[in-house]
Amino acid sequence: MSTLAIIFALVIEQWRPLGERKSVSAALAGWATSLERAFNGGERRHGMVAWLVAVLPPVIVAAVLYWLLSAVSGILALAFDVAVLYLTLGFRQFSHYFTDIQLAIKAGDIDRARTLLEQWRGASGVVRSREEVIRLSIEEALVAAHRHVFGVLLWYLILPGPSGAILYRLAAYLAARWKPVGSFGNFAARAFHLLEWPAVRLTAASFALVGDFENAVFCWRTQARTWSDSDTGIVLAAGAGAMGVRLGMPVQEVDGMQARNELGTGDDADGPFLDTTVGMLWRALVLWVAVLAGAAIVSAITRIAT
């Protein structure tokens, strides 16, 4: 049933995408802000309480509701799974930026590509070169695919019903939202890091399996630890190695030059690597679905045989 829910959610999202989910984002932002105001006393334990209040109720409610629906009808439980996955999972949550940048690069409109990248990453006021625009766009796409697709899938499969998908997306949101708040945000960051530990490694392994395996594993093992955020570094290093492209490297930001180590091996980022990125992400997703479908078939055959 999990495989069917994933397939249905992805198909519906491709047919009728929810885009950036602005209404959902606005509701989450208001909720996170109100919790911060209510609980933030400047200590780590206050952040822990706020995180538990924010995350546990929806996760528990989702698990209980799924259990109740399963007791009534498998179809209702499946529909609930699909509905939640539709809100939490999918390429179309971020791919419009990447696709528009891809089209702008192909059309030779570097100014539009720069503008789109600024909207995606946040304004920096820096005039970037064509190679920088392509390189940073690929980095954003790899991380976004992990956060919006593969990480969600893993935790959906681990916990009952759609509760894992809700847990992962809420944890990711709160970690980013409360990051600037000092010690109050420490627990959210730590909790998300724990959820990311298996997720980033499975995403990296997926990239390796559908790309250049040896390069991906080499870059993962030797380069990921040099990145400022080791979780993100694993995804970027494995993705860059799998595609044979050079990512990372220092970039100019509003507050000065940001030192970043080189990730990947091979060629400088150029237009064709945008297509390569899309192909690798889709192959990785197909791999996940194929493995899940195969496991479901084997399980069904085993039950019939016994």
Spans of model-derived segments:
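Hydrophobic N-terminal alpha-helices or hydrophobic patches in metabolic proteins across all domains
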Residues: 1-306
